[in-house]
Amino acid sequence: VELGYAEADMGLGMGLKTTVEALPAPGALQDIQAAIDHVHTTCGGKVGIVGYCWGGLLTWRSACLLNGLSAAAPYYGGGMTTEAESARQAKVPVMAHFAEEDKWISMDSVSAFKAAHPTSQIFTYAAHHGFNCNHRGAWEAQSAALAKERTLAFFKANLG
């Protein structure tokens, strides 16, 4: 499925997310685990994961539930700061990025998430949800550049 950022595409994407989230466990995580296993089998070495929006939520869940990862970097993970997700504990180092002006993820929930995960690196940016995507109106170049710089340094430190 290839979707853009027009309102109709966003609506279709949300519908697909709802459908996939309704699958019985492990749902999409089994595909992520297969990808991790494939990288280990074919390349060896350490594996990191990064995801944006719903992919950020899946990145968080992967850090908590899957095997074979060495680092995770979720960006504005939609649903990641709920009580249920905050109760999970990561198995690997996590660096998370959130937008201070996100209409879907409140700063109160980010603060609670940060308090629940004191060893995780949590950064916020004066931007909107989707600030890292230069195909969206929410793109914010300075925040995106800083988040990228931090993420690359984080992966270098944890993946080598």
Feature roles, as predicted:
Residues 1-160:
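N-terminal cap/leader regions of alpha/beta-hydrolase-fold enzymes
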